[in-house]
Amino acid sequence: NYMAHQEIHALVRSALAARAGRGAYRLLDLGCGNARLLADTLREFPPAHYVGVDLSRPALAEAAQQLRGLPAVELREQDMLSCVASQADDSVDVIYSSFAMHHLSTAEKARLVVQIGRALKPDGQWILVDVVRAEGQSRDTYVREYREMMTRSWADFAPEHIEQVWGHIAQFDYPEPVTSLAAMARAAGLTEPNVLGQFGPHAAMTFALPR
């Protein structure tokens, strides 16, 4: 639970439970991976239609097994930007993304958020789980401090495994501060972020498209 998956998933479960209580909903999962962490919640509060998108074919194959039994599942081997851009206007009730958006550049994130705002139905919700930088924290400082946190806290990981994970972070992670995400959301017509919880750099938040 080094990335607070248990705590964050409980928050996501509550958000989806609240949405399911309002009636049938369509969910788009950006960067779904193998869908393992979300599968139980989706079985508890099944969407009328689930679309999961990821670039990893093996992960999607595993997701198909994890999501077996849901009413309608569509899995796509596609990047997040093109997937959201292909959605019709006002067509999705919930857009969910977990630990995926930070791989995009700032400009790509801004374009993605605009497309999210376009694709959501009025009163639709974007649930974002991701790493974030502290206000005023540079990316270099974030990467260094994340490595320090792993070295200090990831007791069950061998040093060479920590170095491997850190190498991936140093090369591919480009997290934003919450204020930057808020500015992108405003530009897309979304509400200010409702931060459900933050555990170090790991955060869960929701945005909504006003009615």
Regions found by a protein language model. Give the residues of each.
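Class I SAM-dependent methyltransferase SAM/SAH-binding core
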Residues: 28, 36-83
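Short catalytic micro-motifs in class I SAM-dependent methyltransferases
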Residues: 99-100
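Conserved class I S-adenosyl-L-methionine
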Residues: 23-33
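Core SAM-dependent methyltransferase catalytic element
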Residues: 191-211
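A short glycine-rich, Lys/Arg-flanked "PGG" loop and its adjoining helix->strand segment in the class I
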Residues: 110-122
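A conserved beta-strand element that flanks and buttresses the S-adenosyl-L-methionine
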Residues: 96
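C-terminal alpha-helical "lid/dimerization" subdomain adjacent to the S-adenosyl-L-methionine
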Residues: 129-187
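Conserved alpha-helix/loop element of class I SAM-dependent methyltransferases that forms part
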Residues: 4-23
